[in-house]
Amino acid sequence: ACERVGDGLVAARYLAEAGAHVACYLLKPRDPTVDENFRLVQERGLAILLASEDGKWHRLQHTVREADVVVDALLGTGTRLPVRGALAKMLDQVRRGLAARRQPSREPLTPLGAPPLPAKRDWPFVVAVDGPSGLEYDSGALDRAAVPADLTVTFAYPKLGHFRFPGAGALGELLVADIGTDPALAADVALEVTTPDMVRAWLPPRPLDAHKGTFGKALIVAGSVNYTGAAYLAGAAATRAGAGLVTLALPATIHAAVAARLTEATYLLLHHELGVVAADAAHMLAEHVEEYDALLLGPGLGRERETEAFVELLLRGAGGRRRMGFVGTEESATPLPVLPPLVVDADGLNILASMKNWPKRLPPGSVLTPHPGEMARLMGHPVSEVQADRVAVTQSQATTWGQVVVLKGAYTIVAAPDGRTAIEPFANPGLATAGTGDVLAGAIVALRAQGLGAFEAAAAGAYLHGLAGDMTRAEMGAAGMTAGDVLARLPQAWLHIIGLSTGSQTGSQYHRLPSG
């Protein structure tokens, strides 16, 4: 394994120079004649403790009890599990010491029955170099001996294991430090973590003499009597993500409920059967769909037979060719249109999964936005297989289906058929609530309508959505977040991204809110 002891010794020296009292606890002795960093630490007179001279770990236990900061600089990239022998025992002692320091307060409860808020942190802050010792950097596997960190500092580029669980859950906040690596070294890498600089470059300009057509027209087919909120959230997100005009095509029976909340949209009222879109509504869309720059299909549609028939009719003969069929009866036949760039979400995906040869029915350049359950249905495989290797599965299916795929979840994956892949740097339990997927789909279709390519719209939309989610969580915590809270912060997320100067370090660094 590639060890990080040298990095730890350098950190010890700089901390000492800054005035900290530093002790270095080493698993094995170092030779100062060949280890320059160890020699410099010795010359500074820093305390050096050896595991080989600490048979019952008493000195290690005492050091952890007294420490304000613990720096884990043992194992790095190249680690293979399991961790064994003295190293496993050493990490176990550190973990036990930290756990003892984290014991809850023994003070009496307040009159309301709640424990008092702590005045200050009373246990060490753990910093991991590259990652906790015991993290496998390719798979994200985490040894049981690993010590979870509060902050992980890695260099040049993040590693795949930083975004795969369970290891990703043990990093705390992740910081990618710029060490002057030549960008040309990564020029041919197709897998990237989305950064603010990337999103800023993709977002369209907003000229002073613009009109609403400048920023695109988005058509959203969504909603049913049981899911009025999905239509509202998707439509409102599209307006908040910059689309010039948003039209909601929805069952006429829910129009009043949605329009009362979303006054900025226009509406196309569709025929319905008991509150769900009816099959013959396809001919109504056929008369209007070519007026729009992007189409979102699916949020809250439901899966009734009428709606399934509607989706089948709408997609009949798609694939980018002018279609020679008709929608409706002979008396009211309307030529099938060429669909604008398409985003499919939620029940649209579930209906696709029930159709034979569904990938051939989609126009090129479509974006599919499944959560793991929907992805499993589209693939015909169990969810466990989807989650086992999210990056590889998303890349494979994007190529197989010939469309951009957005696999939602902690560290959302965006993959294009040509192999380009983005990992979105957000893992937020507050987004695990109803409606947040509708907000994401609305953001993506808005960016597609503004002229972004399918991959760029998907990656940028997921970044805006994730950043808005993190802003919401920072303000109100994860437990009480709603999709509407995230929706309200989309403009702030956009402003935050475009407000960052291109010379800032934010483009090469990544900060994540700590877990919990």
Where are the regions a protein language model picked out?
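Glycine-rich phosphate/dinucleotide-binding loop and adjoining beta-alpha-beta core of small-molecule
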Residues: E3-A187, A249-F426, I498-G499, Y510-G516
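Phosphate-handling active-site elements
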Residues: L15-P32, R448-G461, D470-E475
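Long, highly charged low-complexity segments
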Residues: T181-T214, V276
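Short pre-catalytic strand/loop immediately N-terminal to key active-site residues, enriched for Gly-Thr
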Residues: P207, A422-G435
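Radical SAM [4Fe-4S] cluster-binding motif and immediate context
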Residues: P207-H271, A278
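Short, small-residue alpha-helix embedded
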Residues: A376-R377, T433-L464
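Short, well-structured alpha-helical segments that form the helix of a local strand-helix-strand
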Residues: R390-A398, A454-G469, A483-P491, G507
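Charged C-terminal helix
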Residues: L467-G516
